[in-house]
C-alpha cells in the first residue's frame, strides 16, 4: 500500500485494563480478545473488546503491512448463511459464541433463520468475527470517510482505530473525495472490525458526479472492485423505485439520503426503474461469491420529524422486504437500514413493520433523532431514539456525532458519537433483558458504593474522561479512596451515610430498620451541630 502520509494511530491499553485472550477450542491458533479490568479487590472483569491488536502492548503494529490474517477461516465454501442452513458451526460462529458468551448452536440457528448476520468477506481476513442480531448484544457502527472538501488517508485510518478503541463494532467508509480506493484499502488492511461501504458513491465519482451518467455496468464493476478488496457489507438503495419518488414531493425535507437522492435523480432522468432493482439477482450472485452482506438502504428515510413514518418511507420498506427474500434465496446475508428522524411515540412501529415485512432480518438504524432542534447536540437527540429502538429489537445502531448536519466529524466527534451510542446500545440491552448486560452495571455500582474510585473509572465506557472530571476538584491521590466526592463533600455523601447505617447495625446487633432510625438520629444531631447548613466548604 502507498499513502501520501503514513498514518499514526493511538496504541496501548485503555486505562485500568489489559488485553487478554482466550484460546478457541477446535480452531488452532485462534484467540478471542477481551478487555480485562483489574479491580482493587484483586478480582477482574472481562469486557467485550473491539480494539484489535492496537490495545495489546505486545503486538507489533505495522500499518503498511496491515493486520495478520485470522486463523481458521475457510474460503470458497459458501456464505455463512448457506453453511448455517447446512447445520455447520463455522470457525467464525465458534469465535462469536465465545465473544458473546452464548451457545454456538444459538449463533448458527439465528444466522440460519436470517435473524442475524456475520459480515465477513472472504477477502477480509484481518477481522475478528462479530455478529449483528437482536438475540445478541446491540452493536454500534461508526461512519468515517473523507469528503471532497477535507480529510486525508492518514486521518481516516486514525479515526478507524480511534473509533474501535472506544467500542465501534463496525466501520463504514463513506469517502466521497479523492483517493477513495486507496483510503478504503488502508482502512480494510488495518481494521479489526467489519467494514461497510456505499458503492454508489464511488460509482458516482467515476462519472464525474453526474447521476444521469451512471449505468449498471459502472456500478457492477465498482461493487466487484470493492468485493475484491474485502468490503464486508454494502449499502444498496435498491428499494428506491420510480413510482415512490412522487411520494416525497410534499415532504418538509424531501429525500435526505445521498444514495437515495442519486438513484431518484437517475430514475427521473431516464424515466426507468432503478438499475439496482432490475439487476438485483445478478448483484446477489456477486455478493454470494465473496460472502458480502447486504445492508439494504433506506433511501427514502425521513430527514425530519414532520416526515416520519410517511407513505414514501414505508413503501420502500415493503420493497426491501421483497428484496430480502430474493437475497436469502441466493444464500446472501441481509440486514435492513432504518431511519432517521422519528419522534419517540412513532419509533416502535418502525421495528414492528420491519420485522413483519422483512422476515426479522437484523434492523440497522441511524439513530433515530427524536427531535430536530439541537444542531451540535445530535449525538444526544439521536441517542435518545437509539435507546428506544434498541429496546424494541434493533440489532445495530449507526452513530451520529455532534457534527451531524454541520460538518465532517473529527477525532473528538468520533469518540463522542461512539460513547453516546454505546450508552444507547447498552441501555437498550438492559431494557430487553439481554443476558450478561447488567453484570457490568452491577460491578460499577458496587465499586461506586465502596468508594473504589479507580475501579469506577476503569469499568466505565470512558475511563479517561471519568478520571479527568473527578480530578478537576479532587486531584490528590488520597481522593481515589476517599468516601466522598466534590458533589456532596465528606459530611453528606448518601452512600457514606448508608455505609454508616450498616456499620452501626453490625456493631450494635440491630436489624436494618432499627439501625436506620438510630443512625438517622445520630446524623440529625450531627447536622444540627454544623449549623443546619446543607453545603459545607470542601476544606471541612
Swiss-Prot record:
Residues the entry annotates as binding substrate: 143, 172, 201, 237, 257-259, 298-301, 337, 364
Q: Kindly state what the record says about how the cofactor is bound.
A: Binds 1 [4Fe-4S] cluster per subunit. The cluster is coordinated with 3 cysteines and an exchangeable S-adenosyl-L-methionine.
UniProt keywords (A-Z) are: 4Fe-4S, Iron, Iron-sulfur, Lyase, Metal-binding, S-adenosyl-L-methionine, Thiamine biosynthesis, Zinc
Listed cofactors:
[4Fe-4S] cluster
- Positions with a binding annotation for [4Fe-4S] cluster: 485, 488, 493
Top-tier EC class: lyase
- The answer on whether this UniProt entry bears the keyword Lipid biosynthesis reads no
Q: Which GO terms describe its molecular function?
A: 4 iron, 4 sulfur cluster binding; carbon-carbon lyase activity; zinc ion binding
Sorted alphabetically, the Gene Ontology cellular component annotations on this record are: cytosol
Quote the catalytic activity from the record.
5-amino-1-(5-phospho-beta-D-ribosyl)imidazole + S-adenosyl-L-methionine = 4-amino-2-methyl-5-(phosphooxymethyl)pyrimidine + CO + 5'-deoxyadenosine + formate + L-methionine + 3 H(+)
What EC number(s) does the entry state?
4.1.99.17
Task: Give the matching Pfam families.
Answer: ThiC-associated (PF13667), ThiC_Rad_SAM (PF01964)
Q: Which residues hold Zn(2+)?
A: 341, 405
Segments passing through the bilayer: none
Q: Which GO terms describe its biological process?
A: thiamine biosynthetic process; thiamine diphosphate biosynthetic process
Pathway it works in = Cofactor biosynthesis; thiamine diphosphate biosynthesis
Q: Which Gene3D superfamilies match?
A: 6.10.250.620, Radical SAM ThiC family, central domain
> What does it do?
Catalyzes the synthesis of the hydroxymethylpyrimidine phosphate (HMP-P) moiety of thiamine from aminoimidazole ribotide (AIR) in a radical S-adenosyl-L-methionine (SAM)-dependent reaction.
Q: Which NCBIfam families match?
A: PRK09284.1 (NF006763), PRK13352.1 (NF009895), thiC (TIGR00190)
Q: What's the family?
A: Belongs to the ThiC family.
Query: PANTHER family under this entry?
Result: PHOSPHOMETHYLPYRIMIDINE SYNTHASE, CHLOROPLASTIC (PTHR30557:SF1), THIAMINE BIOSYNTHESIS PROTEIN THIC (PTHR30557)
Specify the protein name: Phosphomethylpyrimidine synthase
Task: Point out the gene that encodes the protein.
Answer: thiC
Amino acid at each position: 500500500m502507498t499513502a501520501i502520509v503514513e498514518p499514526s494511530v493511538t496504541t496501548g491499553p485503555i486505562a485500568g485494563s489489559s488485553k487478554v485472550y482466550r484460546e478457541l477450542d477446535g480452531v488452532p491458533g485462534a484467540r478471542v480478545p477481551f478487555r480485562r479490568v483489574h479491580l482493587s479487590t484483586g478480582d477482574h472483569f472481562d469486557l467485550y473488546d473491539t480494539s484489535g491488536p492496537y490495545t495489546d502492548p505486545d503486538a507489533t503494529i505495522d500499518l503498511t503491512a496491515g493486520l495478520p490474517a485470522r486463523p481458521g477461516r475457510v474460503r470458497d465454501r459458501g456464505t455463512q448463511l448457506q453453511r448455517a442452513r447446512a447445520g455447520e458451526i463455522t470457525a467464525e460462529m465458534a469465535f462469536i459464541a465465545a465473544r458473546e458468551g452464548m451457545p454456538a448452536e444459538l449463533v448458527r440457528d439465528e444466522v440460519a433463520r436470517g435473524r442475524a448476520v456475520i459480515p465477513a468477506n472472504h477477502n477480509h481476513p484481518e477481522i475478528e468475527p462479530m455478529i449483528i442480531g437482536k438475540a445478541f448484544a446491540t452493536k454500534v457502527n461508526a461512519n468515517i470517510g473523507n469528503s471532497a472538501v477535507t480529510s486525508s488517508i492518514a486521518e481516516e485510518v486514525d479515526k478507524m482505530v480511534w473509533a474501535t478503541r472506544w467500542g465501534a463494532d463496525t466501520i463504514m467508509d463513506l469517502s466521497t473525495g479523492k483517493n477513495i480506493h486507496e483510503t478504503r484499502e488502508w482502512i480494510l488492511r488495518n481494521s479489526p472490525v467489519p467494514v461497510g461501504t456505499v458503492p454508489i458513491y464511488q460509482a458516482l465519482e467515476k462519472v464525474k458526479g453526474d447521476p444521469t451518467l451512471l449505468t449498471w455496468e459502472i456500478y457492477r464493476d465498482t461493487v466487484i472492485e470493492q468485493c475484491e478488496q474485502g468490503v464486508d457489507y454494502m449499502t444498496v438503495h435498491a428499494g428506491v423505485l420510480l413510482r415512490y419518488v412522487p411520494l416525497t414531493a410534499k415532504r418538509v425535507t424531501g429525500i435526505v439520503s445521498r444514495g437515495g437522492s442519486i438513484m431518484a435523480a437517475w430514475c427521473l432522468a431516464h424515466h426507468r426503474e432503478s438499475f439496482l432493482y432490475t439487476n438485483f439477482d445478478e448483484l446477489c450472485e456477486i455478493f454470494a461469491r465473496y460472502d458480502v452482506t447486504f445492508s439494504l438502504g433506506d433511501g427514502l428515510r425521513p430527514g425530519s420529524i414532520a416526515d416520519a413514518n410517511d407513505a414514501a418511507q414505508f413503501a420502500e420498506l415493503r420493497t426491501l422486504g421483497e428484496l430480502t427474500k430474493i437475497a436469502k434465496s441466493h444464500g446472501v446475508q441481509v440486514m435492513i437500514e432504518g431511519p432517521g428522524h422519528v419522534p419517540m411515540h412513532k419509533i416502535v412501529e418502525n421495528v414492528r413493520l420491519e420485522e413483519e415485512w422483512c422476515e426479522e432480518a437484523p434492523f440497522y438504524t441511524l439513530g433515530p433523532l427524536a427531535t430536530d432542534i439541537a444542531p451540535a447536540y445530535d449525538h444526544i437527540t439521536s441517542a435518545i431514539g437509539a435507546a428506544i429502538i434498541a429496546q424494541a429489537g434493533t440489532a445495530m445502531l449507526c452513530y451520529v456525532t455532534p457534527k451531524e448536519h454541520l460538518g465532517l466529524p473529527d477525532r473528538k466527534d468520533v469518540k463522542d458519537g461512539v460513547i453516546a451510542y454505546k450508552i444507547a446500545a447498552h441501555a437498550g440491552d438492559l431494557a430487553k433483558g439481554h443476558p450478561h448486560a447488567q453484570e457490568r452495571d452491577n460491578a460499577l455500582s458496587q465499586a461506586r458504593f465502596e468508594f473504589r474510585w479507580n475501579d469506577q473509572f476503569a469499568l466505565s465506557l470512558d475511563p479517561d474522561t471519568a478520571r479527568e472530571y473527578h480530578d478537576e476538584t479532587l486531584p490528590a491521590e488520597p481522593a481515589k479512596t476517599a468516601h466522598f466526592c466534590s458533589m456532596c463533600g465528606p459530611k453528606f455523601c448518601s452512600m457514606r451515610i448508608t455505609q454508616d447505617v450498616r456499620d452501626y447495625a453490625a456493631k450494635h446487633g440491630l436489624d436494618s430498620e432499627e439501625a436506620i432510625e438510630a443512625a438517622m438520629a445520630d446524623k440529625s444531631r450531627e447536622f444540627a451541630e454544623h449549623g443546619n447548613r446543607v453545603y459545607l466548604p470542601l476544606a471541612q
